């Protein structure tokens, strides 16, 4: 049997075959034998792979986006031969849902030229048949392409182009390295991103968390919470080389072939079940920081100095308020809280959805209605009413009665 990229075909492959094939194809499994999926997670694991195959980016879409990137690169070369256009984000790390936007970055030797080159690039793209907006900011211009009328990429073509965002590129390299270490990461991340999107809790503009924030929460769980861990912490490896970019150390152990085998053989269903339960009941958002800079993953807001909201000047000279209601330390830009957009009501909704997911997966009823895990929640009002204090307290203090891991 050969199941490429963990493709589950209902009625053809069993859950045991899928999980066995995943471990057989991982370099980390060379010294271990496959362990059967626990009965309690077989059906959920099967369901997860069925959903995963529906939501992941197709080979056709991926090739179309690569073709679009090639076209955009030709446009850039015509106005700036020395500049480089690179992809970053979920498309490049392998963690993209279908119909995802493209995130691109123009790299140049001198930031002084960015405004001039950005405007010329935008004008060249418009002449080439793309449509969009040029957002002139004080220090970092942004090009937002919203459709294409000439090159065959369609009216739904979406692309954001930034300039000299080197830290984001290194973040992408880190995530890409983790996807190469274990084939379970990609479906797990995509399912969590899809779940957050369906539950309306992945919008930084409305007080919840970005998709990148959820990716970091998944990684934190797989590195620092579950025992034995699925991944080592590549940032803290004694073999990693220091590399300073924009004042931050972006070095990590990228010698993946030398990383020792993982001893965690949990099924995808089991990992997701534990992930939802941990953030529903065990992670303490009022006190803890999701961090990758401590060997044990333990860091408090007090230690970090992230206890009160602060303000700073953004790239467009606007005042940005940094909140620490949910604290997620960026792996490289450690002064940046990835969860800074989360409001009190946003955390209430996020925590509530984690609890709802955990309760569903812990249900004693049979069959468990797994479809409801991804049922679309109603769109919340633009202005959230202040959460009732009593209800908030009840939510934050709810426990699942199970302290085992």
Curated annotation (Swiss-Prot):
Consequences of knocking out this gene: Stabilizes urg1 transcripts.
Catalyzed reaction equations: RNA(n) + UTP = RNA(n)-3'-uridine ribonucleotide + diphosphate; RNA(n) + ATP = RNA(n)-3'-adenine ribonucleotide + diphosphate
Gene Ontology CC terms: cytoplasm; cytosol
Resulting phenotype, residue 103 to A: Abolishes catalytic activity but does not affect RNA binding
Entry superkingdom: Eukaryota
EC number: 2.7.7.19, 2.7.7.52
Residue ranges with Basic and acidic residues bias: 386-397
InterPro entries, sorted: MTPAP-like_central, NT_sf, PAP_assoc
One Pfam family it belongs to: MTPAP-like_central
Impact reported for residue 101 to A: Abolishes catalytic activity but does not affect RNA binding
Outcome recorded upon mutating residue 144 to A: Reduces association with a 15-mer A stretch but does not affect association with a 15-mer U stretch
Ranges for domain PAP-associated: 267-336
Predominant cellular place of this UniProt entry's protein: cytoplasm
UniProt: ATP binding residues: 340
Family: Belongs to the DNA polymerase type-B-like family.
Protein name: Terminal uridylyltransferase cid1
Organism listed in the record: Schizosaccharomyces pombe (strain 972 / ATCC 24843)
């Amino acid at each position: 049997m050969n199941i490429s990229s963990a493709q589950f075909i209902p009625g053809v492959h069993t859950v045991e075959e899928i999980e066995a094939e995943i471990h057989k194809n991982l370099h980390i499994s060379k010294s271990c034998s496959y362990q059967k999926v626990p009965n309690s997670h077989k059906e959920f694991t099967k369901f997860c792979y069925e959903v995963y195959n529906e939501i992941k980016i197709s080979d056709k879409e991926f090739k179309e986006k690569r073709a679009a990137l090639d076209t955009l690169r030709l446009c850039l070369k015509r106005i700036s031969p020395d500049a480089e256009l690179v992809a970053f984000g979920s498309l490049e790390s392998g963690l993209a849902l279908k119909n995802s936007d493209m995130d691109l970055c123009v790299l140049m030797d001198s930031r002084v030229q960015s405004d001039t080159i950005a405007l010329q690039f935008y004008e060249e793209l418009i002449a080439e048949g793309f449509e969009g907006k040029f957002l002139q900011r004080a220090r970092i211009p942004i090009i937002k392409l919203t459709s294409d009328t000439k090159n065959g990429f369609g009216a739904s073509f979406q692309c954001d182009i930034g300039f000299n965002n080197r830290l984001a590129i290194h973040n992408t390299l880190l995530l890409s390295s983790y996807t190469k270490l274990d084939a379970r990461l990609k479906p797990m991340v995509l399912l969590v991103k899809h779940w957050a999107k369906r539950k309306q809790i992945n919008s930084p503009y409305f007080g919840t968390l970005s998709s990148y924030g959820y990716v970091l929460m998944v990684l934190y769980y797989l590195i620092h919470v579950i025992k034995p861990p699925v991944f080592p912490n590549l940032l803290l490896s004694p073999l990693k080389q220091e590399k300073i970019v924009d004042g931050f150390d972006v070095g990590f152990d990228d010698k993946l072939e030398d990383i020792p085998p993982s001893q965690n053989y949990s099924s995808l269903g089991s990992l997701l079940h534990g992930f939802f339960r941990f953030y529903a009941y065990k992670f303490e958002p009022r006190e803890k920081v999701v961090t990758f800079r401590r060997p044990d993953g333990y860091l408090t807001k007090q230690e970090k100095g992230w206890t009160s909201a602060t303000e700073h000047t953004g790239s467009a000279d606007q005042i940005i308020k940094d909140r620490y209601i949910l604290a997620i330390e960026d792996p490289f830009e450690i002064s940046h809280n990835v969860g800074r957009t989360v409001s009190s009501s946003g955390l209430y909704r996020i925590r509530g959805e984690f609890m709802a997911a955990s309760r569903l997966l812990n249900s004693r009823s049979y069959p468990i209605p797994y479809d409801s895990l991804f049922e679309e929640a109603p769109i919340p009002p633009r202005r959230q009413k202040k959460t009732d204090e009593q209800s908030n307290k009840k939510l934050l203090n709810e426990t699942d009665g199970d302290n085992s891991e």
